[in-house]
Regions:
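Negatively charged
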Residues: 1-182
Length: 182
């Protein structure tokens, strides 16, 4: 399994593991993606610069216990194609990441699943290349932003059961899926 992984840069932390001093990442030779190394759940601060080589932020902050992670608001995410499960189980996370460039992202599956406090305006994100939004906001109970203007015409796997798990999110604010399958 690990024979397909090549560490490019190690992750470096302060002593109590609350601040990442250097972002780690590796090449997955099987998928040819340059994947960020998952941060500790205690991480409160990361470098302001995301290495340009990184194309996948998959599971980056899974289970993070903080509402705010200093540094991510400045990240240039223009080279990122995969954000699946990025904030999975980040139940307190609720930070403004509206300035991220998501124009090259194709996978946002479960990006905010179980991020029950997240409720930021991400309506300006360019999601026109996203193919997979399955369970993107699953049990993100507080999320109720207006995403009705998102271009989701390329989405093949859409968010399921929006109204069931997000009762405060009005149907007129949902992305307008047309050819997606659940």
């Amino acid at each position: 399994m690990f024979e397909n992984l090549v560490i490019i840069q190690d992750q470096i932390y302060n002593v109590d593991k609350t601040e990442c001093l250097q972002i780690g990442y590796f090449l997955d030779k099987k998928t040819n993606k340059v994947q960020i190394i998952e941060f500790f759940s205690t991480t409160k601060k990361v470098p302001k610069d995301l290495p340009k080589e990184i194309t996948s932020l998959s599971f980056a902050f899974q289970g993070n216990k903080n509402e705010f992670i200093e540094g991510i608001q400045y990240w240039d995410t223009s080279n990122v194609a995969d954000m699946n499960h990025m904030f999975y189980w980040c139940s307190d996370f609720n930070q403004d990441i509206s300035m991220w460039n998501t124009s090259n992202v194709t996978n946002m599956q479960s990006m905010f699943s179980w991020a029950s406090s997240f409720n930021q305006d991400i309506s300006k994100w360019d999601v026109s290349n996203v193919l997979n939004m399955k369970n993107m906001f699953y049990t993100a109970e507080k999320f109720n932003q207006d995403l009705s203007t998102w271009d989701v015409s390329n989405v093949k796997r859409e968010y399921q059961n929006i109204g069931f798990v997000n009762p405060n999110w009005k149907p007129e604010h949902w992305p307008q899926f047309n050819k997606a399958i659940s």
